[in-house]
């Protein structure tokens, strides 16, 4: 009895003493001549008293993928144009991954430094030369050792200021979409999987469009993923699906060279028709929740000509919450479109 009580008290004391914490600092040059020289380092430090196993979320400061990781503003409040990639990523699924580079483990007092080439993600032409404040996204996910589920944690953030002059954008070659479908670095089995996924995605989009055309009032399926019904939001989603339905998914160009184990896929929104597939994509089913076909719907909605959706929330739970709390963002969130199309579990 005494030993059981002591074990319980010790466990409680450990739980009470655990105090996770992070700090996030952006550092770099005070001035650059040309955005090709605008490279900054994010330093993530464990300021708590327990080791943290952090997800290498491609949206965040731990990852080098050119996503919209930074809030960048000049003295007039203007921001550069984002020209990087939009990604499908599900933290709860990444947490279960055994692939390499999915996590960053940081002990108390230790730091991780990551370099970011901002010219790969931002074009400063519209906002112009000037002094900019650079602040990195400060939300992270650590793995709860008790549940093995991701838990959000916000880091104390320190921004960096730099003066940008000279060349304000880096011109990069834009791949030309050819027909029929082209593959880069895809095995024969991957090509077969992509053909099946493209066909299923085409069906998903066609069915979704038909549903939206015939349901012009609140329904369980609509409100689950896009929130309270008003005609303007319905029209926004309808236009997205009208645009996506004009795509021939089987003529997309697919690149299979991405090795990020926890990521499904990504696209450059202004490079219509090219989809880059990553590690998590190949472990997904053809159809169903977070499927290969659904991933193609997600990524196609990111293309500017299809509506240019964002990544405000990832995963079914977060997407449902977004629909409830902020339907204006839900109708512009890629995962909400994917889950509406997958319709799993089925709703009328």
From Swiss-Prot:
First and last residue of the signal peptide: 1-18
Sections of the chain in a coiled coil: none
Disulfide bonds: 186-256, 258-278
Required co-factors: Zn(2+)
A Pfam family assignment: Aspzincin_M35
Protein residues bound to Zn(2+): 298, 302, 311
Propeptide residues according to the Swiss-Prot or TrEMBL record: 19-181
Enzyme class, first EC level, given as a word: hydrolase
GO molecular function: metal ion binding; metalloendopeptidase activity
Site, Transition state stabilizer: residue positions: 314
pH dependence text: Optimum pH is 9.5. Active from pH 6 to pH 10.5. Stable from pH 5 to pH 10.
Entry note: cofactor: Binds 1 zinc ion per subunit.
Cellular component terms per the entry's GO annotation: extracellular region
Record's keyword terms, sorted: Disulfide bond, Glycoprotein, Hydrolase, Metal-binding, Metalloprotease, Protease, Secreted, Signal, Zinc, Zymogen
Principal place of residence: secreted
Residues glycosylated per entry: 223
Catalytic activity: Preferential cleavage in proteins: -Xaa-|-Lys- (in which Xaa may be Pro)
Lineage: superkingdom: Eukaryota
Active site: 299
E.C. code: 3.4.24.20
Stated regulation of activity: Inhibited by chelating agents such as EDTA and 1,10-phenanthroline.
Protein name as it appears in the record: Peptidyl-Lys metalloendopeptidase
Origin organism lineage: Eukaryota, Fungi, Dikarya, Basidiomycota, Agaricomycotina
């Amino acid at each position: 009895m005494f030993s059981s009580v002591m074990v319980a008290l010790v466990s409680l004391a450990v739980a009470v003493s655990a105090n996770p914490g992070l700090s996030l600092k952006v550092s770099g040059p005070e001035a650059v001549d040309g955005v090709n020289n605008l490279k900054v380092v994010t330093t993530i430090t464990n300021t708590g008293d327990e080791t943290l196993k952090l997800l290498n979320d491609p949206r965040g400061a731990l990852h080098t993928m050119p996503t919209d990781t930074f809030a960048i503003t000049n003295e007039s409040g203007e921001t550069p144009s984002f020209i990087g990639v939009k990604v499908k990523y599900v933290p709860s699924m990444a947490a279960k991954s055994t692939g390499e580079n999915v996590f960053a483990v940081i002990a108390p007092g230790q730091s991780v430094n990551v370099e970011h080439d901002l010219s790969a993600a931002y074009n400063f032409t519209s906002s112009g030369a000037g002094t900019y404040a650079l602040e990195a996204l400060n939300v992270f996910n650590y793995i709860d050792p008790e549940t093995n589920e991701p838990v959000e944690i916000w880091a104390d953030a320190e921004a960096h200021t730099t003066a940008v002059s000279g060349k304000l954008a880096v011109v990069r070659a834009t791949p030309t979409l050819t027909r029929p479908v082209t593959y880069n670095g895809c095995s024969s089995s991957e090509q077969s999987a992509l053909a099946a996924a493209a066909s299923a995605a085409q069906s998903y989009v066609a069915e979704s469009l038909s549903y939206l055309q015939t349901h012009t009032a609140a329904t369980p399926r609509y409100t689950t993923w896009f929130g309270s019904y008003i005609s303007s939001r319905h029209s926004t989603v309808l236009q997205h699906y009208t645009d996506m339905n004009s795509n021939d998914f089987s003529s997309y160009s697919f690149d299979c060279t991405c090795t990020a184990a926890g990521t499904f896929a990504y696209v450059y929104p202004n490079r219509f028709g090219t989809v880059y597939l990553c590690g998590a994509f190949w472990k997904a089913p053809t159809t169903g929740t977070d499927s290969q076909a659904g991933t193609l719907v997600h990524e196609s909605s990111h293309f500017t000509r299809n509506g240019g959706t964002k990544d405000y929330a990832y995963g079914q739970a977060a997407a449902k919450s977004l629909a409830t709390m902020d339907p204006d963002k839900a109708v512009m969130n890629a995962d909400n479109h994917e889950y509406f199309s997958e319709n799993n579990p089925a709703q009328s």
